[in-house]
Amino acid sequence: MKHKISRILCTALCCAPLLASAQTSEKSTSPKRLYQEGQTLFQQKAYAAAISPLQAYVRQMNADGKPLPDTGERQEAEYMLVCAAYELRDPKSIDLLRAFLDEYPDTPHANRIYALIASSYFFEGNYDDALAMFNSARLDLLGTEERDDMTYRLATCYLKTGNVKEAAIWFETLRSTSRKYSADCAYYISYIRYTQGRYD
């Protein structure tokens, strides 16, 4: 009898950690936890890793099998998903970014979305469409590093489409404000002056 009680007690002690870990697993799939995990990974620029928890968060259903109500966090999760698609150079990123703008036309992220669409067109070599989207965005409202990247692409678009006057203006502006692009801008400004026959 003593052996039976000790076996039961031993089994209970061995199974207790398994029960505790099962409860932890349930907590990790809660909507709030999924959102926080995805947001943290996104902020760390681990875009590929952020997609899975963010998609799981967006697909969450309530007890009746209906999608959870549209909250600010849901919109933010969808924003992070389309930005992750852009950062990972998804071929469908332009469509995803445009669909996000169609779904949430009043989003506070609209300016950045326009800049990302423009940048996607730039990387495809579609400079006219890139210029149209860059001109829809206010680059001065972006973060410093992203603003400089987008301004460089804008100036390059002007150069590629033959508008050397605008290209020179943007390259000169960027040269005076960005250390990262100062050498590249100086090169392009010299190139533009050379093509115009100005050797000063």
Feature annotation, model-predicted:
Residues K2-I5, S21-D200:
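Acidic, polar-rich low-complexity tracts and alpha-helical solenoid repeat scaffolds
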Residues K4-A12:
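Alpha-helical transmembrane segments
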Residues A12-S21:
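Hydrophobic h-region of N-terminal signal peptides that target proteins for export
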